[in-house]
């Protein structure tokens, strides 16, 4: 019975705490202590032996018998604590008084009250605390009380120790399908998938309306002039276009370069030799060569020679018999033998003959230098070549490629050779320059206001990167 009271008191306290205020806890605790003390007195056997109930009630019956006029009952002792004042709920109404261990049944008075009940008297002094009674037998289990309100969640306990590993049990039957759960958090971004197929071409959109023309902005400040960039590389030579109409005759070109020295012509007919001067005494040198003496005085002029046109007059066959005998004819002082042309040029002797061993030919000294008398033996002498450069006949055997019969160096045939880029001659209409020949162009005429030197590329075009402007 005490356990039931404790449970109800605890429920009452919990409901009082939840429904009313936290200050109701001391009042409920005082009520619980009073009930516990009354139960202890009722179950105690010691009081039954020491003070029996009949012995205790004898004085009261004696008083009842002696007093016949009026019978007054003393009020019960006041509680230890004042009763609580509830505005919302009353905890005492929930206590079942029928289940209390002590049945408080009012005793009917043996005498009838005939007098008027007066006002209640003052409360008497509190009696002494009684001796704790003996705990009675355990009562029957009472009915299940009403479920109390849900309490606050308690503090989370410490994590338990992991259990001992054991073999997994058999797989149970498949449970029923649960309710649909809440949407989970978005997962991490997965890897990029393969490229999809190309979709169909969409329809052409409608042309939008033309927007309004904006306000014309203010004119900006004039920027600084940029730097002169480098001239780009010359591109490849383009395909030659169709020849244009013949232009007007240009001004005469400059004088061409000196041509190559032509072949030496055949030696002419030797004239009669003049009278030789007096010969000096030869002096023998240490090397065995003859030393030429000093030059003698000029001799007298000889008579006019005659020409015999019937027989060819050569060095071998001169027509001496036709001429009159000269008085004191000039004599050759010596004939020198040399190995090469260098040794021949070192000889400065006049009226002398020299024989070159490398050509096996004979030379004589003239005022202009050494001239050949016989280049080769008579039977090996070649005849005069037929044709020459400028006769308007192409002589392939002479190495001619063309023959226009003029000496103009600005056309396509120069010195019986085809003109080409790099020969040093500017070809009119096809080349801008060639070598050092720029025609009449300079930096000043090609780029007005500049100075410097023009250059000619390998494709015979003018390169003006060498020209500079005045800054």
From Swiss-Prot:
Keywords: Collagen, Disulfide bond, Neurotransmitter degradation, Repeat, Signal, Synapse. Residues 70-86 are annotated as: PRAD. It comes from Torpedo marmorata. GO terms for biological process: extracellular matrix organization. This is Acetylcholinesterase collagenic tail peptide. Its main location: other. Anchors the catalytic subunits of asymmetric AChE to the synaptic basal lamina. Expressed in electric organs but not in muscle. The asymmetric form of AChE is a disulfide-bonded oligomer composed of a collagenic subunit (Q) and a variable number of asymmetric (T) catalytic subunits. The N-terminal of the collagenic subunit (Q) associates with the C-terminal of the catalytic subunit (T). GO terms for cellular component: collagen trimer; extracellular matrix; extracellular space; synapse. One of its GO terms (molecular function) is extracellular matrix structural constituent conferring tensile strength. The keyword Disulfide bond applies. Residues 140-205, 237-267 are annotated as: Disordered. Residues 155-164, 242-251 have a biased composition (Low complexity). Residues 1-30 form the signal peptide. Belongs to the COLQ family. It holds the Pfam family Collagen.
């Amino acid at each position: 019975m005490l356990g039931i009271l404790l449970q109800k008191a605890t429920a009452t306290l919990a409901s009082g705490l939840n429904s009313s205020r936290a200050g109701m806890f001391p009042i409920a605790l005082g009520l619980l202590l009073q009930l516990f003390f009354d139960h202890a007195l009722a179950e105690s056997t010691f009081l039954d032996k020491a003070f029996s109930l009949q012995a205790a009630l004898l004085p009261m019956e004696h008083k009842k018998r002696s007093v016949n006029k009026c019978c007054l009952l003393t009020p019960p002792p006041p509680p230890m604590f004042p009763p609580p004042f509830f505005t919302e709920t009353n905890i005492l109404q929930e206590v079942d008084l029928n289940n209390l261990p002590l049945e408080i049944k009012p005793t009917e008075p043996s005498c009838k009250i005939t007098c008027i009940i007066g006002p209640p008297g003052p409360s008497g002094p509190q009696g002494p605390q009684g001796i704790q009674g003996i705990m009675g037998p355990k009562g029957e289990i009472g009915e299940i009380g009403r479920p109390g309100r849900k309490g606050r969640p308690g503090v989370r306990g410490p994590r338990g120790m992991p259990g001992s590993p054991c073999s997994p049990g058999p797989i149970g039957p498949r449970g029923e399908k649960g309710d649909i759960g809440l949407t989970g958090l978005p997962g991490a971004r997965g890897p990029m998938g393969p490229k999809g197929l190309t979709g169909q071409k969409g329809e052409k959109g409608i042309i939008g309306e033309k927007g309004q023309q904006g306000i014309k902005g203010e004119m900006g400040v004039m920027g600084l002039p940029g730097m002169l960039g480098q001239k780009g590389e010359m591109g490849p030579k383009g395909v030659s276009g169709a020849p244009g109409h013949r232009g007007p005759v240009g001004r005469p070109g400059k004088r061409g370069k000196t041509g190559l020295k032509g072949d030496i012509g055949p030696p002419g007919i030797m004239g009669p030799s003049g009278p030789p001067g007096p010969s000096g005494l030869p002096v023998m040198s240490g090397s065995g060569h003859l030393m030429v003496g000093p030059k003698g005085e000029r001799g007298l002029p000889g008579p006019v020679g005659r020409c015999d046109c019937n027989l060819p007059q050569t060095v071998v066959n001169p027509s001496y018999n036709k001429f009159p005998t000269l008085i004191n004819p000039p004599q050759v002082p010596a004939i020198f033998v040399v190995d090469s042309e260098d040794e021949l040029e070192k000889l400065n002797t006049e009226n002398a003959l020299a024989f070159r061993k490398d050509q096996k030919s004979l030379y004589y000294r003239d005022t202009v230098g050494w001239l050949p008398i016989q280049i080769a033996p008579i039977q090996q002498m070649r005849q005069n070549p037929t044709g020459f450069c400028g006769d308007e006949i192409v002589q392939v055997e002479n190495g001619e490629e063309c023959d226009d019969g003029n000496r103009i160096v600005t056309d396509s045939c120069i010195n019986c050779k085809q003109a080409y880029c790099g020969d040093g001659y500017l070809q009119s209409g096809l080349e801008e320059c060639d070598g050092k020949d720029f025609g009449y162009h300079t930096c000043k005429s090609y780029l007005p206001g500049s100075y410097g030197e023009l250059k000619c590329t390998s494709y015979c075009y003018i390169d003006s990167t060498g020209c500079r402007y005045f800054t």
